[in-house]
Amino acid sequence: MEKLLRLCCWYSWLLLFYYNFQVRGVYSRSQDHPGFQVLASASHYWPLENVDGIHELQDTTGDIVEGKVNKGIYLKEEKGVTLLYYGRYNSSCISKPEQCGPEGVTFSFFWKTQGEQSRPIPSAYGGQVISNGFKVCSSGGRGSVELYTRDNSMTWEASFSPPGPYWTHVLFTWKSKEGLKVYVNGTLSTSDPSGKVSRDYGESNVNLVIGSEQDQAKCYENGAFDEFIIWERALTPDEIAMYFTAAIGKHALLSSTLPSLFMTSTASPVMPTDAYHPIITNLTEERKTFQSPGVILSYLQNVSLSLPSKSLSEQTALNLTKTFLKAVGEILLLPGWIALSEDSAVVLSLIDTIDTVMGHVSSNLHGSTPQVTVEGSSAMAEFSVAKILPKTVNSSHYRFPAHGQSFIQIPHEAFHRHAWSTVVGLLYHSMHYYLNNIWPAHTKIAEAMHHQDCLLFATSHLISLEVSPPPTLSQNLSGSPLITVHLKHRLTRKQHSEATNSSNRVFVYCAFLDFSSGEGVWSNHGCALTRGNLTYSVCRCTHLTNFAILMQVVPLELARGHQVALSSISYVGCSLSVLCLVATLVTFAVLSSVSTIRNQRYHIHANLSFAVLVAQVLLLISFRLEPGTTPCQVMAVLLHYFFLSAFAWMLVEGLHLYSMVIKVFGSEDSKHRYYYGMGWGFPLLICIISLSFAMDSYGTSNNCWLSLASGAIWAFVAPALFVIVVNIGILIAVTRVISQISADNYKIHGDPSAFKLTAKAVAVLLPILGTSWVFGVLAVNGCAVVFQYMFATLNSLQGLFIFLFHCLLNSEVRAAFKHKTKVWSLTSSSARTSNAKPFHSDLMNGTRPGMASTKLSPWDKSSHSAHRVDLSAV
């Protein structure tokens, strides 16, 4: 019976429902394998239905509680949930593992999945966990076993690769002193020796884990299992291996459904003469049909765990290695691999599978000469598998690979001279591309945890070297002999840009993959960086394994005191600037009826003031928004537009000033529409283009602004730098003209105050030309604290400077305000209403109609100047 368990994550909870019956029979003549003696010692055995390729035992002594489906063990669906029932002892070792004593308990079964159904999973019934017992689950590309003892509130959990579409043997043992151990296909896969306290694990009155996740969007996964066995003791590793080989028929692969692997014409699982030839052939054929990376990974893992313990010739070892690595390489080319590789556990599991195959090849490699070496290169990796007698090697060290800028060296004295050594080396060509986005908290690198928000990434090839027996190495990094690891860096353009950015600090770690816990974890214990730069690193290590250089880019941060001070300056300065800009706009609006204030220059001042006002108000609001949210993204777009508009109107200010002081380009009316198009139209165009290509770069980092990492910030920086450069050029040209006029006035009239005119003009022009933003360019480095303070102060107070220089201290505005107050005063008097005359700009210049001015300003005293410039033009 291959009962389908229609669950995405199916749970097998063993309940106690004991039927007191015995089944008698006779042993099959073929069942004289010692592994069946291990099976005969079981306390409970359910062979279920006959499965081709899995051997069963018929009990002749009646010592095993044996049953069929719906007798002693049965499957039942309730409300869409498949439940697995058996036995009901309230004080049994099986029901309560804590009562097992020192002998422990063992559970064993064969398991496979059979694809997915299109309909959604029904709602889980209850959704609780069992009070006592264990759980087996397969979900999201990972299998797991959990065991719980309620009396002391302890939980043991271990993860392993799920079975995939082929029969896989899963067995786990538990002892109170040894914890949980999980064996896959007769080999120890993972363990949890210590467990953890879990007092809230389920409810005390719940008997059964209810069968599926509460996820309506997922689809069903058909599962099947066979040969369910319980021993009320923990089997030894030898017993587990013996039973496994007996069940599958002496080293045969696991499934009759495996595509003709090790199958004769009669479909009997027997070993062919060349044990490895069918594996190589099948890998070659299966590679042509690869479609789903997840399924193929499970298939390759089954192959790696089921290789026969037979010797390999050099040619067979070479063919098997090349074929297996080619199959792995083609997985990386599948469309679904990129998404699957985002789970680091999948990538590390693949590396572990490759290590298993290469270790098997090295341990079974035999040759007629003292030194046997099988080496080559594929699209996946360079490899070398060698069996050497160190005393026959004349070199002072063993190096893999022999050529290239990335290699590992072992000193000759580290080898056991009179013992055969097997050496396996792998230099992966592209695996480092999938070793990115590593959270420091998920590693054993203590230094990286100081910057937990900054991810690590592999910046070199992944290189592996294993030697058996292990070389004798110093356990002290200051001693000898030690392993030397030399790796060339392989930075992408983006990584190189981040690493060379002066506002970042780069940390480099000599790291290795630690599989001691059953899962690969990056660590740097026993390794030290001795030298290197941005292109390479050299490490010394006390052990061998998989090595890579990990890099961590950390943005430089100001001290907390500077951060608080700069933040306070920004808040206070922007708030004061907003008030002053409001006052400026109100002043221009009130005086708009006066002819001198109605001209184009003050229209430009008003538009600049409005753009800066809105930008700074939005900036103050953005400080309160959460990055990554929709309001923050909308705010980032608005900030981008209005700050660009502010810069555009600063450019208009510069061009208009240039036209007034240096050249005359035509009437003001003819330039009016161009100025408005430049001030409001160009920024809108830039924002639309930026949104079209980098919409995800708005408000997604640590603030409501453009992303620096994606390069979208250049949609603001490039136009801003252009405006700054142009306006600095205009400021220099205008300053030269003003300086010339001042010098002429001093020569002719001897007026020393004329020299003050240059300084005054520069002070008046700086706020409207935006040249103070140059301090923002100088403040990009975290060390330039003084420029950051200057930038924060000058730009947060831009509105204040505009109000001071272009309202309070502007002679035209003051004169217009005086005239306006007179008009208001005269308007209130009925005596002068009929005789009131229109106001003209002549009054602003201190003259009356028909009369010449009797007082010249410093601008007018130079009769030799090529330009007669009114002071108000500045």
From Swiss-Prot:
Residues 854-874 are annotated as: Disordered. Changing V485I: Does not affect subcellular location; does not change G-protein coupled receptor activity. Autoproteolytically processed at the GPS region of the GAIN-B domain; this cleavage modulates receptor activity. Cleavage takes place early in the secretory pathway before N-glycosylation. Its main location: membrane. Changing R199H: Does not affect subcellular location; does not change G-protein coupled receptor activity. Changing D453N: Does not affect subcellular location; increases G-protein coupled receptor activity. Residues 371-557 form the GAIN-B domain. Changing D32N: Does not affect subcellular location; does not change G-protein coupled receptor activity. Changing L808T: Does not affect membrane trafficking. Abolishes receptor activity. Changing L619A: Decreased activation by 5alpha-dihydrotestosterone. It is found in: Cell membrane. Residues 546-554 are annotated as: Stachel. One of its GO terms (molecular function) is G protein-coupled receptor activity. GO terms for biological process: adenylate cyclase-activating G protein-coupled receptor signaling pathway; cell surface receptor signaling pathway; G protein-coupled receptor signaling pathway; regulation of skeletal muscle contraction. Keywords: Cell membrane, Disulfide bond, G-protein coupled receptor, Glycoprotein, Membrane, Receptor, Signal, Transducer, Transmembrane, Transmembrane helix. Changing I713A: Strongly decreased G protein-coupled receptor signaling. GO terms for cellular component: cytosol; membrane; nuclear speck; nucleoplasm; plasma membrane. 17beta-hydroxy-5alpha-androstan-3-one binds at Q563, N795. Changing R233W: Does not affect subcellular location; does not change G-protein coupled receptor activity. Changing A441T: Does not affect subcellular location; does not change G-protein coupled receptor activity. Changing T630I: Does not affect subcellular location; does not change G-protein coupled receptor activity. Changing H605A: Strongly decreased G protein-coupled receptor signaling. Changing Y658A: Strongly decreased G protein-coupled receptor signaling. It is a multi-pass membrane protein. Belongs to the G-protein coupled receptor 2 family. Adhesion G-protein coupled receptor (ADGR) subfamily. This is Adhesion G-protein coupled receptor D1. It comes from Homo sapiens. The lineage of its organism: Eukaryota, Metazoa, Chordata, Craniata, Vertebrata.
